[in-house]
């Protein structure tokens, strides 16, 4: 695929070392500031460079009045479960995604046993066939929670069956039994305050093991200001997986296996975007919303080619076989697919890798945080504003006391059409 200067670039040969920058530990925000929307906001565009150094509560001033703002409504679950063996050994079960039932809504609403793909800490001390037991209290009643190790998967994860007494939904059980999983780079244990600090005002659909952190800056006051300006809002669902923290260990990104995440988009929003005038601005809140919306486009292209199997492959966007449909035509294919299958929403698994030279087909800009050096999220940012601009933005932020990563400050980026 050609880059913005017309030169042919092989995305798979992009060196991750070109996306490394020095991030001192003291610049990593360990907690959010007291007033969420008082964090700093750096506004920049691919062509315009740095536009403003301001605060997040001023966000509405920098969005065109015709903006459609799309955010992720996923909610972080208390995914860390700890069990103590009779020998005293501590076993941690980190729930990643449901396997049986695989549907998130059915899994969380059900009261029967569930099977999850999990990471297991201290797994060598837990023999297969030996169940672990723990007790929790729900509404003053003691509940017994049991974990059974079924099998180890090729990637090192385990299939774990969880069952419990009391007839409560799994949503209530994991909420009572688990601990919220904060990012590993915070280098601290989770605290009581994280149960609220690490949820967005949009969160309502259980399923993530990490927060869509760009949404952490929004407050009722910011939402009210957006409403007063007439800015429309809509929601998508991407359940953020632990793979979002997976470092790129290979020198070339072509050797990196992109993690899969589940996306859910309602039919009505797909229709709205398909009918959206191209002159209007669509801003995604967070890289998860970006990935969801762009995956939606590629889903339509796969449907058009009769190749849809429920998964957007990692490198499909760059394939010579890609049909490069217009946004409207691709989303029309998705709508036709939903109609023919009598579905009200699209559920898919995306492995989409957004890297430099990627052509954004749905979003015009995004609200996001400052990301880890050498991460796939930084590649996504570079794809939007360019290599020179992301470095200029990050250098400026480091020189002007911006706070980085999940609990840090925010950016508003435009791809500048």
Model-derived features: positions:
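Surface-exposed, charge/polar-rich loops and edge strands
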Residues: 2-417
């Amino acid at each position: 695929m050609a880059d913005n200067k017309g030169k042919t670039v092989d995305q798979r040969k992009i060196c991750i070392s070109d996306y490394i920058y020095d991030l001192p530990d003291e610049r990593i925000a360990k907690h959010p500031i007291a007033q969420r929307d008082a964090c700093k906001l750096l506004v920049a565009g691919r062509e315009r460079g740095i536009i403003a150094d301001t605060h997040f509560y001023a966000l509405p001033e920098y969005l065109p009045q015709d903006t459609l703002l799309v955010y992720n409504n996923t909610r972080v679950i208390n995914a860390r479960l700890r069990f103590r063996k009779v020998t005293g050994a501590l076993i941690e079960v980190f729930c990643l995604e449901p396997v049986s039932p695989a549907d998130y809504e059915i899994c969380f609403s059900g009261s029967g046993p569930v099977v999850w793909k999990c990471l297991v800490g201290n797994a060598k001390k837990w023999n297969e066939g030996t169940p672990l037991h723990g007790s929790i209290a729900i509404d003053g009643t003691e509940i017994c929670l049991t974990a059974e190790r079924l099998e180890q998967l090729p990637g090192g994860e385990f299939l774990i069956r969880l069952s419990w007494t009391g007839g409560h939904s799994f949503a209530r059980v994991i909420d009572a039994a688990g601990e919220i999983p904060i990012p590993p780079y915070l280098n601290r244990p989770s605290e009581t305050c994280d149960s609220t600090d690490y949820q967005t005002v949009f969160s309502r659909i259980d399923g993530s093991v990490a927060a869509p952190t760009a949404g952490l800056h929004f407050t009722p006051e910011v939402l009210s200001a957006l409403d007063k300006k007439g800015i429309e809002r809509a929601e998508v669902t991407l359940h953020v997986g632990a793979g979002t923290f997976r470092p790129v260990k290979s020198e070339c990104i072509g050797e990196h296996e992109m993690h899969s995440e589940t996306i859910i988009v309602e039919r009505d929003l797909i229709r709205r975007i398909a009918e959206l005038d191209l002159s209007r601005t669509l801003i995604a809140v967070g890289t998860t919303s970006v990935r969801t919306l762009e995956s939606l486009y590629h889903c339509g292209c796969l449907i058009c080619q009769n190749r849809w199997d429920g998964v957007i492959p990692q490198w499909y966007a760059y394939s010579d076989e890609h049909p490069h449909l217009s946004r409207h035509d691709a989303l029309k294919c998705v709508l036709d697919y939903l109609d023919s299958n009598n579905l009200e929403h699209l559920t898919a698994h995306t492995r989409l890798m957004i890297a430099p030279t990627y052509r954004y087909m749905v979003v015009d800009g995004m609200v996001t945080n400052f990301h880890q050096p050498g991460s796939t999220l930084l590649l996504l940012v570079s794809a939007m504003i360019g290599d020179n601009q992301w470095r200029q933005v990050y250098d400026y932020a480091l020189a002007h006391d911006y706070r980085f990563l999940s609990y840090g400050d925010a950016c508003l980026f435009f791809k500048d059409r």
